[in-house]
Amino acid sequence: MSDAASPAGSPAAEPTEHRDEDQVNETHQDDGSNHGGNDEDNDGGNDKDSDVLSEIDENEFGDDYGSRPVDIDENVAMKLKARRKTTTETTKKPKEGRRPKKRSRGDDDVDAADDDGERRPRKVRAEGERRARKEVEEQQAQQEENLTPDERRRRALERAIDAAVKNPTKRRRKKDDIDLEEETDEQIANLKVAMEKACVADNEAREQKQPAVHKLKLLPQVTAILNRTAIQDSVLDPEINFLQSVRYFLEPLNDGSLPAYNIQRAIMSALMKLPINKDVLLSSGIGKVVVYYNKSKSPSADIKRDAERLLGEWSRLILKRTDDYKKRHIEMREIDVGAVKLGQREGGSSQVTLTQRPAGKSRYEIERERALAPEVRNNNRARPVGLPASYTIAPKSTYIPGQAPTDHRPIGHSGHEAFRRMTQKGKGKR
């Protein structure tokens, strides 16, 4: 079929030049996409393609092929690989340049101008001062080397006296030009006055048969002061003597009744956390109240336990005893081996005198005391042995390394010898 015989409107009927122009415009609109194929396929103006298209019957494509299911082989589908995106399909993100590094504060900070008029960083200035100080110290050391021993000793003594006499500068905490320590002392002084007034008011209320609630109202402020670790020095200062007012809170009222349980519980718990020393105990007198709570039957069991624990800790401060087992001092005495053997031979009566025998006595003195002792009647009775429950004196070790003992037989070896002789006699009779 020729081009002239093709139906109107078919691709073959259009002029070749117009078709080429339309295809060029479509390629420009697609922005360089690859859907069009190569140049030979896009041409489409040759006679062979037009002849093939003109011979196809359009009625054969009347059925809808899109709705029919398509069979896909799974083995083939699994072998397919995902296509990677080409560089032309994705737009590249513009590359950013390097960001400037942040400079440290020490490099930026500079002090005032130096003698030469230049502004230098603070680190450089500190290094210069350190170097100058080191040079001065080296010069002083060289000067001391040239001095006599007496002059060196005199200078060392002067430096030691200056260091001992010089008082350390005590920095006082300030906030907004307000001295916090003075404010704390004033607050404690005002609270002391309020606590004493509350104690007097509770005693007057009990005399009038009314409930004593003034201490309970003031209790939160008292516990807040006692539990603040930052002002413990002010609380324990003997000059301020805040614990004396705390003692008034714990003391019984005039009618003999104890304060409320909440007061006892809160103050006892706070006292166990405070590092109280001997001077504070003497100035405040709070130990007397703790002793009363320990011996009285009125407080509850937990309050008595706390009072007993406080009494034990404070007694160590007064008696200068430590609760460290390593620092414990144990009295030691030398043991008299001859007296121990003599007591074992004489039987059970020596057990009573073993604990009563003082150190340093000879065997003759021990036997003389036993002979002069009054007679014990009713010997046929069985009496418990009077041994102490615990020992307070430890024997002193007489072992000398590298030296052979004079008496190698241990204590109680004579009984083994008697038993051995008895067994030998029995064998001889057989």
UniProtKB/Swiss-Prot annotation:
What residue spans carry the region label Disordered? 1-153, 402-430
Q: Which GO terms describe its biological process?
A: poly(A)+ mRNA export from nucleus
UniProt main location, coarse:
nucleus
The keyword Transcription appears for this protein? yes
- Composition-biased stretches (Basic and acidic residues): 15-33, 124-137, 406-420
What does the record list as coiled-coil region(s)? none
Task: Read off the Gene3D superfamilies from this record.
Answer: Conserved domain common to transcription factors TFIIS, elongin A, CRSP70 (1.20.930.10)
Q: Where is the composition biased (Low complexity)?
A: 1-14
**Localization annotation:** Nucleus
Free-text function comment from the UniProt entry:
Transcription factor involved in RNA polymerase II transcription regulation. May function in both SPT15/TBP post-recruitment and recruitment steps of transcription.
Family named by the database record: Belongs to the IWS1 family.
Name of the protein: Transcription factor iws-1
- Its gene? iws-1
